[in-house]
Amino acid sequence: NCHKAVYHSIYLRRLTPVYLYPDIVPGTSLAGTLTKEQIEAALIQNPDASAVLLTSPTYDGITADIASIAETVHRFGKTLIVDAAHGAHFGFHPGFPKSPVALGADLTIVSLHKTMPCLTQTALLLQKGSRVSTERLRLFEGIYQTSSPSYLMMAAMDSCMDMVKKHGAGLWDSFFTERERFLERCSSLKRLQVLTDGTKWSRKMTSETGFLMDSGKILSETSKTCLTGKRFYDILLKQYHLQI
């Protein structure tokens, strides 16, 4: 579930990674995310580890129990870094999971362009607390970041945040109204399954794994239909102009 930027960092800094593998969500082919038990066991076996990095939410919207993981990581005196690229909208509406920042993560990366109205490449690195040195963070930011930042992108991020501040509540309320309408219409489907937060599937997943589901993600399961995933993708794109 890691972004290739993580592997680039490992290569450039000559780090020694320890890999933890998430379980598959029961009844699906979806990779879950990590649990506090997995992380605690890994920290016991690797006491010289500097930090824990995990992806939450995943590309499919599956979210880890960041609060309990943060407590575990900090108990061992380590830093928690969360790649929340697909969770830039977290914390802006009670219908979404809380932001990792609010749950104890020391560093959180969010990609505005993935789930918010912003230009491609726009992202934020969020810091909480003093476990990570701000001076050191700024030092390496200056090393790896361009010395000629795009004012177009910075203006886009400002505009995005301004819109969320002024109109976000109403826009998210409208989103959830339309979402409920969509799910109600999908409830009559006999073969095509819709997997998202609030459905029987997500409640079962949470009870079995402890993972949460991002309400902003809507997954479709085609295994009980005559369609392949690729064919379903093509139909949505060509006939309905929806790209997934």
Positions of the model-derived regions?
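Conserved C-terminal alpha-helix-loop-beta "cap" of PLP-dependent enzymes
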Residues: T177-I244
